[in-house]
């Protein structure tokens, strides 16, 4: 199923670029990163087709299904900057919509700012005579009042998808499951016509794709013909449709074959072939595009899982009034003091219940609800959390305040009927194949969700890639440079995401962590950010490359280490000087005591 909906009253502004961009781009996966990339290409004059294996995510069924498995997203500086690098559909960068809002503003309007963490610590267990007691500890994210923004993934995706559909250069194809891709189709076709063998290319490049599981989300739009408006020869046989090229063309460089869901009750699916000049792989951690590239080039690739899974839960609103209800308390959705009757918990906090090997988190939504995620080892889901009695016992002991808000019956139903989802990370290198394909988003660097940087990093991919593309005439030179410059940053954020899981589950209540946090806050209040900034602030509230963030943090740790050693040496030296200078007082007493002990 394809969809094209254009705003005919809005003229499409083309952004300036030095690069000779491809005529037709295929974006595989219609998720947030894919939609943003599609808009960026479309605004530079490219015809874009977005291909998505799943149905339209804007339907009620799709929204309900996504709410059961998707972790809320935390949008911060890198993601906001990435959104602002791509203008609204039909408008140039730096040009606001009539109401003065840009794409980032539209997304932020549908988010809830979180200025701090709220740590929930059980200080007294429940007993027969008294209720459990939970202490809440607020930890500000920034000394400058900066916030991260909780946004529903489906809502964000639909905003970007709507704006992609508004652009006249974009077409979206839903329920198109990629089956095979030939990145060198034009080379092979030309060699076949000339009667000469094509250059040596691994013949297995496409075979692996048959029946592959595609989980991606971004794709790019095309003319209704799917072939750039050129003449085509179409043949149909046994439910398959093949659009044959009418001669060698720049848009014939890459061939993509899809299985397409059919509404015909006699034919469950049909086959469809599309051609493109360039492919953007935004098809998630199990990327088919990445696997196809890996069979053609020497790609370094790892996919690691951790022994922790997650299940989504929900805290409903206090009332049905939603985010527009009467202000109360100390936490409003506008980031200022004041709250709303709809929220059971402070709305401007990311709530964490750290319990070492497992934890619960809750992020606010505009309607007053909280999206909760329980992270725990798989063996815990299979044992303590597999029965009603076990679930209630775990929550009464570790999350008594959350249990009262979630509702015991709904909690038990969620944990006994839903399967825990896996968590893992992907690392690969390079991110491109010649000037024909590139990987961005989770397809290039899926990461653990504990730093809240997955989406932000994906949006930053788009910004960084086009910053480089716009400065170079050759697309291949630009992509070579993108891989070279981006790889150290992506390795760094993958490591930071793994480290932050340990911090959230263990360290947030430890005295070394709290001491370092206070020291960072003190130094940041008296020194400029160029001289001192916390690791979290550099990662979340700046666009500093991730690799430089890690180097800066190591330097700051070294400074603190040297300062502690110097302080210890100074203390010992001062004590030694004090002892020596007062020897006239303690030396006679010491001599007499030793003499008495000796005589006895």
From Swiss-Prot:
GO biological process terms on file: 'de novo' NAD biosynthetic process from L-tryptophan; anthranilate metabolic process; kynurenine metabolic process; L-tryptophan catabolic process; quinolinate biosynthetic process
Ranges that cross the membrane: none
Coiled-coil residue spans: none
Named cofactor requirement(s): FAD
Pathway listed: Cofactor biosynthesis; NAD(+) biosynthesis; quinolinate from L-kynurenine: step 1/3
Keywords, in A-Z order: FAD, Flavoprotein, Membrane, Mitochondrion, Mitochondrion outer membrane, Monooxygenase, NADP, Oxidoreductase, Pyridine nucleotide biosynthesis
Region Disordered: start-end pairs: 217-242
GO cellular component, one term: mitochondrial outer membrane
GO molecular function term, any single one: FAD binding
EC category: oxidoreductase
UniProt cross-references to InterPro entries, sorted A to Z: FAD-bd, FAD/NAD-bd_sf, FAD/NAD-binding_dom, Kynurenine_monooxygenase
Record has Flavoprotein as a keyword: yes
Cellular localisation: Mitochondrion outer membrane
Function: Catalyzes the hydroxylation of L-kynurenine (L-Kyn) to form 3-hydroxy-L-kynurenine (L-3OHKyn). Required for synthesis of quinolinic acid.
Family assignment from sequence similarity: Belongs to the aromatic-ring hydroxylase family. KMO subfamily.
HAMAP family: Kynurenine_monooxygenase
Protein name per its UniProtKB record: Kynurenine 3-monooxygenase
């Amino acid at each position: 199923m394809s969809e094209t909906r254009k705003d005919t009253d809005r003229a499409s502004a083309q952004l300036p670029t030095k690069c000779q961009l491809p005529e037709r781009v295929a974006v595989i996966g219609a998720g947030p990163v894919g939609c943003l990339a599609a808009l960026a290409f479309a605004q530079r004059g490219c015809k874009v087709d977005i291909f998505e294996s799943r149905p339209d995510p804007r339907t009620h069924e799709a929204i309900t299904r996504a709410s059961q498995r998707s972790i809320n997203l935390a949008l911060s500086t890198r993601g906001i900057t990435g959104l602002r690098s791509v203008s609204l559909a039909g408008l140039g960068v730096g040009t606001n919509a009539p109401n003065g809002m840009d794409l980032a503003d539209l997304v932020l309007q549908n988010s809830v700012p979180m200025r701090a963490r709220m740590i929930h610590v059980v200080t007294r267990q429940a007993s027969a005579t008294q209720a459990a007691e939970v202490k809440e500890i607020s930890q500000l994210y920034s000394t400058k009042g900066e916030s991260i923004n909780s946004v529903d993934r489906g809502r964000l995706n639909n905003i970007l998808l709507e704006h992609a559909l508004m652009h006249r250069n974009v077409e979206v194809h839903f329920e198109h499951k990629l089956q095979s891709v030939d990145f060198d189709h034009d080379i092979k076709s030309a060699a076949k016509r000339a009667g000469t063998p094509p250059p040596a290319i691994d013949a297995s490049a496409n075979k692996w794709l048959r029946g592959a599981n595609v989980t991606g989300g971004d794709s790019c739009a095309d003319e209704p013909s799917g072939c750039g408006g050129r003449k085509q020869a179409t043949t149909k046989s046994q439910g398959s449709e093949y659009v044959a090229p009418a001669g060698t063309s720049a848009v014939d460089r890459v061939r993509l074959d899809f299985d397409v869901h059919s509404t015909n009750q006699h034919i469950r699916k049909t086959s469809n072939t599309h051609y493109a000049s360039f492919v953007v792989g935004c098809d998630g951690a199990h990327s088919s595009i990445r696997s196809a590239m890996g069979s053609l080039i020497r790609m370094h690739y790892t996919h690691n899982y951790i022994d922790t899974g997650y299940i989504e839960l929900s805290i409903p609103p206090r009332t049905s009034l939603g985010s527009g209800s009467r202000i109360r308390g100390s936490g409003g959705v506008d980031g200022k003091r004041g709250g709303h009757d709809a929220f059971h918990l402070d709305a401007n906090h990311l709530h964490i219940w750290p319990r070492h090997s497992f934890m619960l988190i809750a992020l606010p939504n505009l309607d007053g609800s909280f999206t909760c995620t329980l992270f725990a080892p798989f063996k815990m889901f299979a044992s303590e959390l597999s029965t009603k009695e076990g679930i209630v016992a775990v929550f009464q002991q570790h999350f008594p305040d959350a249990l009262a808000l979630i509702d015991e019956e709904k909690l038990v139903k969620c944990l006994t009927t839903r399967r825990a989802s896996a968590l893992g990370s992907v690392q690969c290198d390079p991110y491109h194949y010649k000037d024909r394909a590139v990987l961005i988003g989770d397809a290039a660097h899926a990461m653990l969700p504990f730093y809240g940087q997955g989406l932000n990093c994906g949006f930053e991919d788009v910004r960084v890639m086009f910053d480089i593309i716009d400065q170079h005439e050759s697309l291949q030179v630009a992509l070579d440079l993108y891989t070279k410059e981006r790889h150290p940053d992506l390795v760094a954020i993958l490591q930071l995401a793994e480290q932050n899981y340990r911090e959230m589950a263990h360290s947030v209540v430890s005295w070394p962590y709290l001491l370092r946090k206070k020291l960072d806050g003190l130094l940041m209040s008296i020194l400029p950010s160029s001289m001192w900034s916390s690791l979290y602030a550099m990662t979340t509230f700046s666009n500093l490359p991730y690799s430089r963030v890690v180097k800066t943090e190591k330097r700051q740790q070294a400074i603190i280490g040297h300062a502690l050693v110097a302080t210890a040496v100074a203390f010992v030296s001062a004590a030694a000087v004090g002892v020596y200078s007062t020897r006239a007082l303690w030396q006679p007493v010491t001599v007499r005591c030793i003499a008495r002990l000796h005589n006895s």
